[in-house]
Amino acid sequence: MLTERQLLVLHAIVDDYVRSAEPVGSRSISKREDIPYSPATIRNEMADLEELGFLEKPHSSAGRVPSQQGYRYYVDHLLSPHRLTVAERAGLSRLTTARLQAMEEVFQESARILSEMTSYVSIVLGPESINERLRHIQIIPMSNQKAVVILVSENGHVENRLVQVDENVTPSDLERTVNLLNERLVGTPLSSLQRKLNTELAQLFKAHINNYEHILHMLQQSMVPASGEKLFFSGKTNLMEQPEFQDVEKMRLLYKALEEENLLQKWLRAQQTDGLHVSIGQENELEAFESCSVITASYAIDGRHVGTLGVIGPTRMEYKRMIKVVDSLSKDLTKRLTGFER
């Protein structure tokens, strides 16, 4: 259990180090109005905090910096709520006021807003479309015997599939096909479309559509299940501006991890719990993020948690503000998706 004096000193060191990125000395802390102690007293407390594992002393420096344990204690016990400024509220409101037609645009705009407001890397894990149900299907003929098959899910997720159309297939064939598909497949999970097409619709096509074999083959191509969730990033270069990431090898590992989408999806799914989650340093399972802090929050559609958004930055992070921004945007995203035009 830390004493009141140790709590004040730890709080001051974290605040000063987050702001300056320089080791904090006892003299600079003693000049703060909220610290009524002499430099000598503060030095003693800093030594005790270091011994307890809350502070670290960088080589060739008289000052101290917070350790991972120090940051964790700070986040869990010392943070006070952050009140959004007028500018921050305006930045967040862009998500609910922007004219966005597709769900993917909403996710990308969320990532963009988050990276701009935090100056860190932002990441949004979209919902797993394979579990969604079909709301509508459309086939739009293109030139050169091609067409676009558009699948719209009940959650507003849109998938476009470019397919080859046999020269014998007529516009009236396509129109009858679309009518049958919407009549029989609406409400079907996207993952089951191909199976239902081959079992239930094949005979209907044979009875009602000319050139049904060509159309059946075309639709089989378009209804291959999607690979799963999509990741949306913004601000990947932001970390290069942070002093902690001037090390080329550290940045290389981080960039490599950000390119491994399957690994990131698995990692983010593991954090997809109700509410907000803060991982500091080596608490992150991915080795490339051991020098980072990650703040994530889940978002929902119609009360069901379907995805995660968050920021990746240095452990020297303005936690109070970042937590509020991530939490607020997750709630705004939930509102936007729940009210998505259907």
From Swiss-Prot:
It holds the Pfam family HrcA. InterPro entries: GAF-like_dom_sf (IPR029016), HrcA (IPR002571), HrcA_C (IPR021153), WH-like_DNA-bd_sf (IPR036388), WH_DNA-bd_sf (IPR036390), WHTH_HrcA_DNA-bd (IPR005104), WHTH_transcript_rep_HrcA_IDD (IPR023120). SUPFAM superfamilies: GAF domain-like (SSF55781), Winged helix' DNA-binding domain (SSF46785). Belongs to the HrcA family. Negative regulator of class I heat shock genes (grpE-dnaK-dnaJ and groELS operons). Prevents heat-shock induction of these operons. PANTHER family: HEAT-INDUCIBLE TRANSCRIPTION REPRESSOR HRCA. This is Heat-inducible transcription repressor HrcA. It comes from Shouchella clausii (strain KSM-K16) (Alkalihalobacillus clausii). The gene is hrcA.
